[in-house]
């Protein structure tokens, strides 16, 4: 995979008005804007069924951006759905930077009575750990983080999902489209080049674009891919510029791991097929949208909230799967190739059954060689020292909770 840097920067991650419990009022009852971002305190709602209702939990959520970010909107929607399903009170804080503001937001939520607090961005982690140490009676969870298994705190947890499975399936959708373009004479086999707009050179991003590429190559053997990085999780101008440069460089299909509409809208303007992330972009890009993969966080939120209600421990590392409903594809767009739905369903069944492993070492090489062994940096020291063997049984074991839930695949494969 060819990687290009587009303004890559130094590595960095992906007010408390209390609300009265109202029982049936789903409306937001307070909203204030503070220096750290926006706080919304939402009232409790009736649980979907009596059997779903929990008591004794007030949840607080910290988001890097607001609903304008597809990444954060995905979390916002899941938090709302889970809390309303379980009938609990919850508060949200949006536009919280990856800095001391995250610690302050966590403390404000704890002081407002939240006993389950969740933060959604990689760079929030150190500040949430700091808050967890200060509030030992509050349970804190953090998405995409790497340190729960080494911190040794009973009240700090990491969570993620096997989104590489979703990316792989989305790659199959892309590969099927490339095959259609080849069959129609729009491109030759040698011109089946995809482009990928990534945010940072994190393992999470590398894991994602590699699984997407492997999915595409499983059905379109001649595919190649160029990858570029913007140095930001959310920069619509940079993402649009990156997509346009990839298109100008001969890429005939674009995907991304960045949070704005920059790449999808560039594709719609250029008439280039697009595979998006974190939610369907079909409404804005009806002519070029193919599919989107996402982590569905609702199952994790329900699990963690029920643990707090029951007084049972939350897993130190939790990784959702296709089976738990934590990894999802959107509905297919109208521009997909014929037979795509059937190909995706067959591949999904094989992934769930364990017949297919995304990082099967027989399906890729690194510098022309099979990856028979690889030590990953699981414990995350400042020097990123490799410390655990993660290749066994013929495949790279990504996001294995025996190690940690956050991705650690940081291998640049051939292609």
Predicted segments with their positions:
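Sec-dependent N-terminal signal peptides
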Residues: 1-5
């Amino acid at each position: 995979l060819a990687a290009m840097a587009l303004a890559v920067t130094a590595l960095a991650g992906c007010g408390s008005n209390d609300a009265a419990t109202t029982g049936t009022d789903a409306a937001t009852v307070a909203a204030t804007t503070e220096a750290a971002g926006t706080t919304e305190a939402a009232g409790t709602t009736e649980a979907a069924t009596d059997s779903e209702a929990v008591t004794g939990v007030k949840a607080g959520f910290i988001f890097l951006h607001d609903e304008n970010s597809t990444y954060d909107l995905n979390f916002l929607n899941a938090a709302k759905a889970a809390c309303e399903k379980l009938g609990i009170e919850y508060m949200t804080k949006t536009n919280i930077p990856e800095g001391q503001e995250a610690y302050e937001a966590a403390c404000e939520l704890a002081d407002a009575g939240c006993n389950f607090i969740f933060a959604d961005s990689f760079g929030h982690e150190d500040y949430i750990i700091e808050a967890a140490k200060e509030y030992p009676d509050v349970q804190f969870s953090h998405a995409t983080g790497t340190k729960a298994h080494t911190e040794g705190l009973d009240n700090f947890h990491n969570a993620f999902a096997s989104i590489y499975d979703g990316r792989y399936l989305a790659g199959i959708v892309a590969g099927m489209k490339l095959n259609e373009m080849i069959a129609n004479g729009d491109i030759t086999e040698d011109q089946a080049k995809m482009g990928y707009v990534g945010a940072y050179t994190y393992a999470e991003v590398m894991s994602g674009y590699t699984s997407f590429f492997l999915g595409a190559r499983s059905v379109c053997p001649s595919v190649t891919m160029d990858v570029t990085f913007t140095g930001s999780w959310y920069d619509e101008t940079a993402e649009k510029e990156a997509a346009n440069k990839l298109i100008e460089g001969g890429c005939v299909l674009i995907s991304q791991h960045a949070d704005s509409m920059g790449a999808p809208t560039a594709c719609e303007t250029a008439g280039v097929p697009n595979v998006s992330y974190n939610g369907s972009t079909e409404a804005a890009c009806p002519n070029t949208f193919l599919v989107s993969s996402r982590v569905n966080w609702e199952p994790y939120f329900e699990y963690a909230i029920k643990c707090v209600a029951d007084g049972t421990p939350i897993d130190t590392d939790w990784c959702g799967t296709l089976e738990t409903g934590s990894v999802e594809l959107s509905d297919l767009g109208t521009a997909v190739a014929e037979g795509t739905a059937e190909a995706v369903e067959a591949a999904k069944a094989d992934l769930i059954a364990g017949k297919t492993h995304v990082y099967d070492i027989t399906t890729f090489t690194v510098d022309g060689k099979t990856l028979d062994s690889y030590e990953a940096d699981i414990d995350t020291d400042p020097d990123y020292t490799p410390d655990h063997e993660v290749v066994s049984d013929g495949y790279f074991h990504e996001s294995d909770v025996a190690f940690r839930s956050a991705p650690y695949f940081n291998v640049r494969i051939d292609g």
